[in-house]
Amino acid sequence: MATIYYDKDANLDLLKKRKVAIIGYGSQGHAHALNLRDSGVDVRVGLAAGSKSKAKAEGAGLRVLSVAEASKEADVIMVLIPDQTQKKVYDEEIAPHLSKGKALLFAHGFNIHFVQVRPPPDVDVLLVAPKGPGHMVRRQYQDGRGIPGLVAVHQDATGQAKAVGLAYARGIGCTRAGVLETTFKEETETDLFGEQAVLCGGAAALVKNGFEVLVEAGYQPESAYFECLHELKLIVDLMYEGGLAWMRHSISDTAEYGDYTRGPRVVDGRSKDEMRKILKEIQGGHFAKEFILENQAGGPTMARYRAAEAAHPIEEVGKRLRDMMSWIREAKKDSSDPGSR
């Protein structure tokens, strides 16, 4: 069982004595910076020259510096930029300013676990990862609640790495809900597996195949969209609220019986075998190498996939149907704007 830490286990004063730099001001970056500031922490934001986020950060009352300047000033540096850009930014702008005793933090372990970022031995290296999108991290904090999170220590040079991580987690509100202790290896490998096999890759492929089967059988694309994509949220929300048992309790007997008797025919032993293969590719570093080389080449494979998927009929049908749903437009605008609340 995982060890879980709460507010009582975290000393926020430990962080208030230090200067914190948030590198990046996207979904997570804006939430971390604002929550830490509101918790009484000395925060600055490090952004690339010409960043479109500068005006938003300054508009929120935050001090904005270059990545190098922020890293030089800070004792605690949280890296919240995309995985594929972290190595270059780290090597050129953060590493030169990592003096002894500083703490380097990440919200995802990819670049540490797969040895793309190599911190010096005299700094703390740790992970603090809220298990929710940035706008939710911010809103829950503002409402006096918090998002569950993860904490992990890769390198404890000062003897205080975990304490710093817990203080940071408290500063952004995660210890209000509970923070689970993990490792960089576990966070990275399970996160990638979940994305590829279930949450993104698996779910998207299942939805698209279901849509195609119905359309190919002569049903209206609009009906196929509603049944295979739109209503997925209704089911996932039930799982989210109470697990599989609550979902099955909440649906019709017809749907429940079909779940038990037909679901395993769609996602069967062969699917599980492929999941095992995907996990081995992650554990062995094969996916990481493939992704790194893809980005070094300029992302040609990603570009082809994006173009092909954007042209799939489900996208055009979905756009037309979503235009009928005012609540979706409002929710999308709200969640995409860091300053919306």
Curated annotation (Swiss-Prot):
<protein>
    <recommendedName>
        <fullName>Ketol-acid reductoisomerase (NADP(+))</fullName>
        <ecNumber>1.1.1.86</ecNumber>
    </recommendedName>
</protein>
<feature type="binding site">
    <location>
        <position position="191"/>
    </location>
    <ligand>
        <name>Mg(2+) 1</name>
    </ligand>
</feature>
<keyword id="KW-0479">Metal-binding</keyword>
<feature type="binding site">
    <location>
        <position position="227"/>
    </location>
    <ligand>
        <name>Mg(2+) 2</name>
    </ligand>
</feature>
<feature type="binding site">
    <location>
        <position position="252"/>
    </location>
    <ligand>
        <name>substrate</name>
    </ligand>
</feature>
<dbReference type="GO" id="GO:0009097">
    <property type="term" value="P:isoleucine biosynthetic process"/>
</dbReference>
<keyword id="KW-0460">Magnesium</keyword>
<dbReference type="InterPro" id="IPR036291">
    <property type="entry name" value="NAD(P)-bd_dom_sf"/>
</dbReference>
<keyword id="KW-0100">Branched-chain amino acid biosynthesis</keyword>
<comment type="similarity">
    <text>Belongs to the ketol-acid reductoisomerase family.</text>
</comment>
<feature type="binding site">
    <location>
        <position position="195"/>
    </location>
    <ligand>
        <name>Mg(2+) 1</name>
    </ligand>
</feature>
<dbReference type="GO" id="GO:0004455">
    <property type="term" value="F:ketol-acid reductoisomerase activity"/>
</dbReference>
<dbReference type="GO" id="GO:0009099">
    <property type="term" value="P:L-valine biosynthetic process"/>
</dbReference>
<feature type="domain" description="KARI N-terminal Rossmann">
    <location>
        <begin position="1"/>
        <end position="182"/>
    </location>
</feature>
<feature type="binding site">
    <location>
        <position position="231"/>
    </location>
    <ligand>
        <name>Mg(2+) 2</name>
    </ligand>
</feature>
<comment type="pathway">
    <text>Amino-acid biosynthesis; L-isoleucine biosynthesis; L-isoleucine from 2-oxobutanoate: step 2/4.</text>
</comment>
<dbReference type="InterPro" id="IPR008927">
    <property type="entry name" value="6-PGluconate_DH-like_C_sf"/>
</dbReference>
<feature type="binding site">
    <location>
        <position position="134"/>
    </location>
    <ligand>
        <name>NADP(+)</name>
    </ligand>
</feature>
<dbReference type="InterPro" id="IPR014359">
    <property type="entry name" value="KARI_prok"/>
</dbReference>
<dbReference type="Pfam" id="PF07991">
    <property type="entry name" value="KARI_N"/>
</dbReference>
<keyword id="KW-0028">Amino-acid biosynthesis</keyword>
<feature type="binding site">
    <location>
        <position position="51"/>
    </location>
    <ligand>
        <name>NADP(+)</name>
    </ligand>
</feature>
<dbReference type="InterPro" id="IPR000506">
    <property type="entry name" value="KARI_C"/>
</dbReference>
<feature type="binding site">
    <location>
        <begin position="25"/>
        <end position="28"/>
    </location>
    <ligand>
        <name>NADP(+)</name>
    </ligand>
</feature>
<keyword id="KW-0521">NADP</keyword>
<feature type="domain" description="KARI C-terminal knotted">
    <location>
        <begin position="183"/>
        <end position="328"/>
    </location>
</feature>
<dbReference type="GO" id="GO:0000287">
    <property type="term" value="F:magnesium ion binding"/>
</dbReference>
<dbReference type="GO" id="GO:0050661">
    <property type="term" value="F:NADP binding"/>
</dbReference>
<keyword id="KW-0560">Oxidoreductase</keyword>
<feature type="binding site">
    <location>
        <position position="191"/>
    </location>
    <ligand>
        <name>Mg(2+) 2</name>
    </ligand>
</feature>
<dbReference type="InterPro" id="IPR013116">
    <property type="entry name" value="KARI_N"/>
</dbReference>
<comment type="function">
    <text>Involved in the biosynthesis of branched-chain amino acids (BCAA). Catalyzes an alkyl-migration followed by a ketol-acid reduction of (S)-2-acetolactate (S2AL) to yield (R)-2,3-dihydroxy-isovalerate. In the isomerase reaction, S2AL is rearranged via a Mg-dependent methyl migration to produce 3-hydroxy-3-methyl-2-ketobutyrate (HMKB). In the reductase reaction, this 2-ketoacid undergoes a metal-dependent reduction by NADPH to yield (R)-2,3-dihydroxy-isovalerate.</text>
</comment>
<feature type="binding site">
    <location>
        <begin position="83"/>
        <end position="86"/>
    </location>
    <ligand>
        <name>NADP(+)</name>
    </ligand>
</feature>
<feature type="active site">
    <location>
        <position position="108"/>
    </location>
</feature>
<dbReference type="GO" id="GO:0005829">
    <property type="term" value="C:cytosol"/>
</dbReference>
<feature type="binding site">
    <location>
        <position position="53"/>
    </location>
    <ligand>
        <name>NADP(+)</name>
    </ligand>
</feature>
<comment type="pathway">
    <text>Amino-acid biosynthesis; L-valine biosynthesis; L-valine from pyruvate: step 2/4.</text>
</comment>
<dbReference type="InterPro" id="IPR013023">
    <property type="entry name" value="KARI"/>
</dbReference>
<dbReference type="Pfam" id="PF01450">
    <property type="entry name" value="KARI_C"/>
</dbReference>
